Amino acid sequence: MALALIHPSKRAYSLAPLNLKEELQGFKVQGDRKGVGQEPLCKQFRQLRYEESTGPREVLRRLRELCRQWLRPETHSKEQILELLVLEQFLTILPRDLQVQVLEHHPETGEELVGILEDLQLDRGKAGEQKDSAQRSRPTVLVGEPAPRREAREQPGCALPQKPEERGKETRSENGNLIAGTDSCGRMESSCTMTEPIEAQCEDLSLKKNPAMPKEKTNSQCLETKERLVQNSGLIEHDRAHTGEMSWESVGSQSSVAADHQEISKDKGHPCQECGKVFQRSSHLIRHQKIHLGEKPYQCKECGKVFSQNAGLLEHLRIHTGEKPYLCIHCGKNFRRSSHLNRHQKIHSQDEPRECKECGKTFSRALLLTHHQRVHGRSKRHHCNECGKAFSLTSDLIRHHRIHTGEKPFKCNVCQKAFRLNSHLDQHVRIHNEEKPYKCSECNEAFRQKSGLFQHQRHHHKSKLA
């Protein structure tokens, strides 16, 4: 039976949820897979060996099992399985360095993978152009020649002091002035009248060669402001203020900044036609366009909530599974999102709690205090249609609605008990894990909930609390 194919341009928006992140992790370099336990199913299917099984029937059964676990035909359509196979083979034939760079962006469709590769090729081309331009702009230096002599070679009218063995014949007039001379190779060197800036540069070069020689103070006068300067080199720098001339150092630095700015503006070359937002990579633009199209192909099988990106679905599934992969190294507490862990870690770095000036309530983080202060400064504009109760935040109204609807989206994986709030599920899971994080500082008795610790302290340590 032939597979029904769809156009590649539409496939990126019409595919149902594919949990590609799990499959794509199998293509990472072995050096990046430290600490990973089980091999991905696609690699187990590809690398199964006949010698590892007891017989041909066992090999066939194992291959069918691995293929079904990998492709999941009971949940995926033919188009989805085809897309998964094409994407897997595409990643397999990529060079190793490109595999690593592509997997950092977590492509979800073949179109996104192509967009990522095109962006990488564009970046490599720009890097090569920058390297070539840097080599072309680098000044040519004569090897084996001292720096002062190279500077003098660039100034034809400036002659360096010659060594005795290098001096040729010199022709002088009757009054002793040098008319022409020959160098050690026999070439004629004609005299010329040097301008004042070149004389100043020759003077600086002679001082570099003979640092012990005292430098005479010469009074130079600016023709514009009649200001007198001690050295001719100072007059050169002073004249640039009137003429607007820039030294080669400042010109080079400003041109490099302008070039960097142009490169940045070139990178942002993928604008959204709907809202005008610009993206550096075409793959990012493809993901962003799903917002305007209203496409939410990734649906949660537990509660039916839909998402525009597969990453959002994977993050949402942690609510139902109870998975909290982000661990705080200070207190051992786990979190579902990395942003929650970052906010939590600020508790350990702060010594003093933050207090609300309106009601005196204290908070461990400034963000919680800001969130709480909205209660005092904002009117309760969100009313419940069932009981008329008002709330200042829409999130509080949504949580309150679950009381009337009876919705309990947070389910325990062990006993299947459902809860209205995620915090209630966290407290319930401690029963199965036998976790008691709240410990009495007086007698070291532990409790699962903070309220149990408070009741214990009021009854058994009432005198010490007073």
UniProtKB/Swiss-Prot annotation:
GO terms for cellular component: cytosol; nucleoplasm. There is a cross-link at K21 (Glycyl lysine isopeptide (Lys-Gly) (interchain with G-Cter in SUMO2)). It comes from the Eukaryota. InterPro entries: SCAN_dom, SCAN_sf, Znf_C2H2_sf, Znf_C2H2_type. It holds the Pfam family zf-C2H2. SUPFAM superfamilies: beta-beta-alpha zinc fingers, Retrovirus capsid dimerization domain-like. May be involved in transcriptional regulation. Residues 124-182 are annotated as: Disordered. This is Zinc finger and SCAN domain-containing protein 26. GO terms for molecular function: zinc ion binding. Residues 124-135, 163-173 have a biased composition (Basic and acidic residues). A zinc finger (C2H2-type) spans 220-242, 270-292, 298-320, 326-348, 354-376, 382-404, 410-432, 438-460. It is found in: Nucleus. It comes from Mus musculus (Mouse). PANTHER family: ZINC FINGER AND SCAN DOMAIN-CONTAINING (PTHR23226), ZINC FINGER AND SCAN DOMAIN-CONTAINING PROTEIN 23 (PTHR23226:SF76). Residues 42-124 form the SCAN box domain. Keywords: Isopeptide bond, Metal-binding, Nucleus, Repeat, Transcription, Transcription regulation, Ubl conjugation, Zinc, Zinc-finger. The lineage of its organism: Eukaryota, Metazoa, Chordata, Craniata, Vertebrata.
